[in-house]
Amino acid sequence: MKNIVPDYRLDMVGEPCPYPAVATLEAMPQLKKGEILEVVSDCPQSINNIPLDARNHGYTVLDIQQDGPTIRYLIQK
């Protein structure tokens, strides 16, 4: 995947689930169509919650990268 530069970053490292998913869904409506939010989380359950919730709300999950316990999501409105 080419190098995508997000418009905004939401750092949820250290926050327990479901807060990363909830915060992602609260942040997304503030973006303009086409803008990208980077979400960083170390909650293991977020790998299931964040992509599913984003898709269910009509957002596009562009990329998911895991580096040790940290998971990085790129979500486009």
From Swiss-Prot:
Signal peptide positions (record): none
Question: Which CDD domains does the record cross-reference, listed alphabetically?
Answer: YedF
> Which residues are responsible for catalysis?
17 (cysteine persulfide intermediate)
Family annotation (SUPFAM superfamilies): SirA-like
> What is a biological process (GO) this protein takes part in?
DNA damage response
Give the family, as the similarity comment puts it: Belongs to the sulfur carrier protein TusA family.
Q: What is this protein called?
A: Putative sulfur carrier protein YedF
Q: Which organism is it from?
A: Escherichia coli (strain K12)
